[in-house]
Amino acid sequence: MTRVLAGRRPVLEAMRGNTKVRHIYTEPERTYPDISEAAEAQGIPMANRDRAGLDKLSDGVRHQGVVAIAEDYEFCEPEEIIAHAEGPPALVALDEVTDPQNLGAIIRSAVTLGLDGLIIPKHRAAGITAAVVRASAGATEHASIARVTNLQRTLLSLSKSGLEIVGLDAGADIDVRNLEPSPRGRVLVVGSEGKGLRRMVRQRCDIVVHIRQEGPMDSLNASVAAAIAMYEISAKQLGAANDG
């Protein structure tokens, strides 16, 4: 099975990562030396296709004149993410985040901040589509992502294995900035925009935190809130690793 990557940056990041890119199509009127050089080095065939053809191939995702065909996204297991962590693991789990832009932005932040991986549900949630890859600026191609059938069961299993499960909820009493470093490792759980954490998912959390807000606005976009919380979590885990 294959998937489509749309846009210069996502295609470049795919070639820089471990993604198997099969073909690259570009507009004949434009040149892409960085993509051409990388494709030639990896033996990836390139061909021209007009804008209408690229629009159809990308299924409406903005492509900047570059579309690639790659092998299906390779998910991993949560246990694999933990096993490859160099220090106390830091992961983010997403509870029914359905908006591709939010998912892509969260993946980009997680990769940039050095989190070990992400966990997303198989159902009632956005998948790793061309729109998500583009929204992540290609960060999906560098991320370790597990896709699970039952998020609640996965969180329970991770908690039993020793990780601390930290939920993010605007109504919580504890400020995320007040978390202490955890030598066990942590999983940050972020809910969907509007709905937040589902009740059963919230019950699986060992602790629930909020982001302190001082201004006149009373809410944050889901991806922005996730980025702030991930920064705090990653900083705490870095401190725990250094202390160890």
Please report, for each region that a protein language model flagged, where it lies by residue.
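Short acidic-hydrophobic, aromatic-tinged amphipathic segments that line or gate anion-handling sites
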Residues: 46-50, 144-152, 209
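Short, hinge-like loop/turn segments at secondary-structure boundaries
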Residues: 64-67, 134-139, 182-186
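Short, acidic/turn-prone active-site loops that include or flank metal/cofactor-
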Residues: 29, 51-53, 123-125, 193-195, ...
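Structured adenosyl-cofactor binding patch, chiefly the S-adenosyl-L-methionine
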Residues: 12, 17-18, 112, 117, ...
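Short amphipathic alpha-helix with an adjacent loop that forms part of the alpha/beta core around
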Residues: 79-85, 157-159, 177-182
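Active-site/ligand-binding-proximal alpha/beta "capping" segment
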Residues: 166-221
